[in-house]
């Protein structure tokens, strides 16, 4: 099978991050089983233009490493981890996971995508906080 064009892969990963952020937010807030969240998302949303492998890597990888991920960015915060907005916390976890585990993705892409998600889902100035 021929590799996908770069712009197609980028768009599919963008959707994977979008759904991944929503699914991880749901996990954070409701504590539902990851398998249930994944099944719900795959039933309720069109995954035909989503990088499913990337979505699954985020959905299962972030919770598996949540303590290590938070330990990596917590010293850099200007407030306690418990005081972070849940969207900000989710995006920082995801971004840290991508920076550590997805070395195939340029760090600038990880930051740009996290900021874009913060603008879409976060509080008024969340994107500034995510951008550092």
Where are the model-predicted features located?
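N-terminal interaction/assembly modules
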Residues: 1-132
């Amino acid at each position: 099978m021929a590799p996908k064009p770069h712009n197609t892969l980028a768009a599919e990963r963008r959707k994977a991050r979008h759904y991944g952020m929503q699914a991880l937010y749901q996990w954070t807030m409701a504590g539902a089983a990851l398998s249930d969240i994944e099944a719900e998302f795959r039933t309720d949303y069109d995954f035909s233009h989503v990088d499913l492998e990337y979505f699954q890597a985020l959905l299962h990888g972030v919770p598996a490493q949540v303590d290590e991920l938070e330990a990596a960015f917590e010293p850099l915060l200007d407030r306690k981890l418990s005081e972070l907005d849940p969207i900000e916390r989710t995006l920082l976890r995801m971004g840290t996971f991508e920076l550590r585990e997805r070395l195939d993705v340029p760090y600038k892409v990880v930051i740009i995508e996290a900021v874009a998600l913060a603008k879409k889902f976060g509080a008024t100035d969340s994107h500034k906080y995510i951008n550092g």
